[in-house]
Amino acid sequence: MRVALCALALTSCPAAAAPFNSCGSGVCFSGNINHNAILQRAPERSAVYGSVNTASPAGAQVVVTLAGTAADGSAYSKDFPAAVNADSTYKALLDAMPAWGNFTITATCSACAGSPLSVSVVGVTFGDVYLSSGQSNMELALYNTFERNISLANVRSGKYANIRVLHGGYQGLPPNQDGNWILQPGPNVTNCSQTGLADGMWCSGLELAQHDDNSDGRSAFFNVRAVPWYFAEKLTDLFLSDGGVPPPPIGLVFNPVGGTMVEQWTPFEDQLSCASIACMCTSSGCNGSQPLNPNNQSACSRNGELWRGQQQPFVNMTLKGFLWYQQVQLDRRSPHPGA
């Protein structure tokens, strides 16, 4: 089952205000920057960001080093200093890099508190990165589609080796938390064939195809989200059909949550200007008839919860575009189903 989608091209987002610190060690990367990550290629400058121990002194500086082999085989190494902000976060913009290459990224903060004072991720390359969000239609796994076995056979034969996926997990945040502008660091594991599709790990299709899910014995590749994977397959095929142009690496970041409403994904403040948006139900009761206003954010805590928990960590990530798929939950309340 194929689904046709279009992706909206983006440039890198500006640094966000008041990020949330989630690194208790000396220095760390945000969890979306892990081993085997795909970062956005030129002409954009890809962002590398994270946080340091909150006890670090004022004026501390993180040096982000990108070193490795470029696509043309030449050696590359360059430092990118990044000031530590008052909230203990940092962000560096790398040079615009062409597709492919094999790099190590290191963040070092010799003046920071705690340990380690230097962390590295390996196997990083550059390509086109897409954020895939939405409701259960986007959450649907390959296992539930008709062409899953065709995709599995293609991956095992070495096709679509340019595609890597990152599973972002789930985190909804109440309004009394500003939200995560970075993610918890991912597992220090470099090959998904031993783990399957785990939160915070960049995985190739072949690695997942080599791992059986212990819960039911099927290939872990079938746990990949179907819509973005088929999108990346089709995009790869289009590159190859265009005079045999080698496809770039394609990075797919998954963070959909089934059974959700668009109000959960939208910043609370942005919903205040729309009179038709009401307060969503909470665990303590339903305030559905209550209009939103700046003073009832606690009572209407579900409005915006997924923006704070699911989307904010990727605001600073440089992207090629995004995929959004949501319908069923909205249909249940719409006078025009499917609209």
In which residue ranges do the predicted regions lie?
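Cell-envelope and extracellular/periplasmic
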Residues: 18-339
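Cleavable N-terminal signal peptides of Sec/SRP-targeted secreted and luminal proteins
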Residues: 1-16
